[in-house]
Design a protein with these regions (language model features):
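Preference for long, solvent-exposed alpha-helical segments and helix-linker "stalks"
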Residues: 84-202, 209-213, 240
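Start-of-helix register in tetratricopeptide repeats
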Residues: 23, 57, 91-92
Length: 317
């Protein structure tokens, strides 16, 4: 029995080390892609996929990097594997400029046909009208926020340009919320098996962008949906964090970012037990907080964060 336990412990440690190495390689490959070093990016994706090749998004990103590096053979290999592992966004696949140099290859038509046939099987039992409605809602929810992200690079937060965009966004959000509440009240939290992953994500995004009372009302429904596989645990974590912060408590997963009114710099809003945040994030399928905060050009230093936490809590009152 002791030998079995020892073997299991070694297996656990080996798996943990491999998982950490995989995440590190993927993160570095992503950085190299962003700096247009596509060959080095491809090399690191290749090393990562020798450890594990199950994540369809990572495989797709690897295909993009290898395509841009001119390695079409590897690009098709990873692209087809991503489809086998669950990549289903045909619209994005057809429009992705990273893959343009694959279009002239005979394998391209076969790859598109492969995904189309897979989608036919997957979508055979879809609620097509509901899917179309949710995809429209998703587009309305995201397109103005994309514009906001682009505009704030050029104009101040209190500029007329930003104020006008936020006014439109708030109006669209209120319309979308009425539609989503009707869907949730009549049909429940509809899973991706009925409308597809993209359309399913619209439910979360609209609730995430709604008022506190609405968020609290639909939180139990989303929790139940997660247990049934109809909603993402990571998305639920983001909703929980937002509610916790809005109600004056510390967040759990570190997903909510605030702006210091004095320095105008951004920071991770008050967080419980910062030392173990990555453990909690891993449990719900979220990546390391050090990678997450880079989206706001922040560097995660847990000791520095803990030393500043009492002051950050004052800012949030």
């Amino acid at each position: 029995m002791r030998n079995n336990i020892y073997t299991l412990l070694l297996l656990f440690l080996f798996t943990s080390v491999n998982a950490q190495e995989y995440s590190k390689l993927i993160s570095e490959a992503d950085k190299l892609y962003e700096t247009k070093n596509y060959k080095m990016s491809t090399d690191l994706y290749n090393k990562a996929f020798k450890i594990e090749s199950k994540n369809p998004n990572h495989l797709y990103n690897g295909a993009c990097a290898s395509s841009l590096a001119g390695n079409t053979k590897k690009a098709f290999k990873w692209l087809n594997l991503s489809i086998e592992k669950g990549w289903t966004n045909l619209k994005h696949l057809n429009s992705d400029t990273d893959l343009e140099n694959l279009h002239s290859k005979k394998e391209w038509g076969k790859t598109i046909e492969k995904l189309e046939k897979k989608l036919e099987l997957i979508e055979a039992n879809y609620d097509k009208p509901l899917q179309a409605e949710l995809l429209t809602i998703l587009d309305e929810d995201q397109k103005y926020r994309v514009q906001i992200n682009e505009t704030q690079k050029k104009f101040a937060q209190d500029s007329k340009e930003m104020q006008d965009l936020w006014k439109i966004t708030i109006q669209k959000d209120s319309i979308n919320l009425l539609k989503v509440k009707k869907i949730l009240d009549e049909k429940g939290w509809v899973g991706k098996d009925k409308v597809g992953a993209q359309a399913n994500s619209a439910l979360f995004l609209v609730i995430q962008h709604s008022d506190l009372e609405t968020q609290k009302k639909y939180l139990p429904m989303m929790k139940e949906a997660v247990t049934k596989g109809n909603a993402s645990p990571g998305s639920l974590a983001l909703l929980i964090d937002r509610i916790e912060i809005r109600e004056g408590r510390k967040q759990i997963y570190g997903s909510q970012i605030g702006t210091n009114p004095n320095t105008k710099t951004q920071y991770v809003l008050p967080l419980i037990d910062p030392d173990n945040v990555d453990k909690r994030r891993t449990e719900v399928g979220l990546g390391p907080i050090s990678d997450y905060v880079k989206n706001w050009n922040l560097i995660w230093d847990v000791e520095k964060y803990k030393s500043e936490l009492s002051e950050l809590e004052k800012l949030n009152k």
